Amino acid sequence: MKALYMVFVLWVLIGCFLSGECHRAPRGQHGPRRTLAPSTHHRHYHLYPLPDPNHVQFGVPPFLPTSSGFCKPHSLSLYAPPFEIVIQPSSIIVTIPGLILTLSSDPSPQRNCPARTPPRVKANIIPGPITAQLLPKLKIPLIILDDSRK
């Protein structure tokens, strides 16, 4: 969970530093009607179309493949140029152009998808006569406190 917070904080900080709010002229040189000299314009070349910088898109950018071939259909993708954060149930993938950081708890992805989801099991079942008979077969220790000795 700490890794998720670190990725989110990193994403927010990088987004703040790359936004137009952080690129300001030195004090006393701000003129809203004055145009910048051509030598101060920065040209950025991108290999993919840039969306609106003030809008965060949910989904996969058009230049990335939409299917990884693994059985992880439920994933969340946050895309703010030029960064993409893909959050999947068992891994977090952060893609930055020129740098790839992958944090994964499952080193081998699941290749065989189950046909259906396993049935849900209730966690608050009070042991009754049937459950008490099954406990010795399941090799689960059963502790019984006897308060009759006083």
From Swiss-Prot:
GO terms for biological process: response to toxic substance. Residues 1-22 form the signal peptide. InterPro entries: SMR-like. Keywords: Detoxification, Secreted, Signal. It holds the Pfam family PROL5-SMR. One of its GO terms (cellular component) is extracellular region. It comes from the Eukaryota. The keyword Transmembrane helix does not apply. The keyword 4Fe-4S does not apply. It is found in: Secreted. May play a role in protection or detoxification. PANTHER family: SMR1-RELATED, SUBMAXILLARY GLAND ANDROGEN REGULATED PROTEIN 2 LIKE-RELATED. This is Submaxillary gland androgen-regulated protein 2, isoform alpha. It comes from Mus musculus (Mouse).
